[in-house]
């Protein structure tokens, strides 16, 4: 074990100290209710924290509700919402159970690829440039972001990060 001793020793990333170098990478699982954290999701992360992960990353935390559609249609099922303060209590629950077992928590903030399924709007993938394929579906028409939309997305990421911080993540 001496060969791998560094794996189990505490270390710092910036001003955050992790108890070891084991990181649970983000994954999206079917344990949310319309983007809200459920008891099952809290239990899922608690079990990983009990396993002594130094850092647990919550997968697919959407920074915006792109179109406010009902019912929700999305390409990443099981994603958590992070675009409104109403989601903070759920993230607090995850942070509390993970911290109780000594694990730090991070969130994978991401922009959702959600669209209207009504047929009223064309299915467009948003991209930094219309000439660079970057959407989730190859061959799907892409639309370049405007400068105003880019500024809005940057703002949404900042707001979501603040919500995570407020939740103890």
Describe the function of each predicted region.
Residues 1-169:
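Flavin-dependent oxidoreductase catalytic cores
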């Amino acid at each position: 074990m001496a060969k791998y001793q560094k794996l189990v020793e505490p270390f710092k990333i910036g001003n955050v100290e992790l108890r070891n170098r084991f990181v649970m990478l983000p994954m999206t699982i079917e344990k949310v209710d319309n983007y809200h954290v459920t008891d099952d999701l809290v239990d899922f992360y608690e079990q990983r924290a009990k396993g002594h992960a130094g850092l647990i990353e919550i997968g697919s935390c959407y920074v915006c509700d792109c179109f406010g559609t009902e019912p929700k249609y999305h390409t990443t099922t099981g994603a958590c919402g992070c675009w409104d303060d109403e989601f903070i209590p759920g993230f607090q629950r995850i942070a509390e159970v993970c911290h109780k077992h000594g694990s730090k928590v991070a969130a994978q903030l991401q922009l959702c690829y959600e669209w209207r399924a009504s047929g009223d709007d064309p299915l467009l993938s948003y991209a930094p440039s219309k000439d660079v394929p970057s959407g989730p579906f190859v061959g799907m028409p892409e639309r370049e972001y405007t400068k105003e939309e880019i500024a809005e997305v940057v703002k949404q990421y900042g707001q979501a990060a603040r919500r995570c911080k407020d939740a103890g993540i």
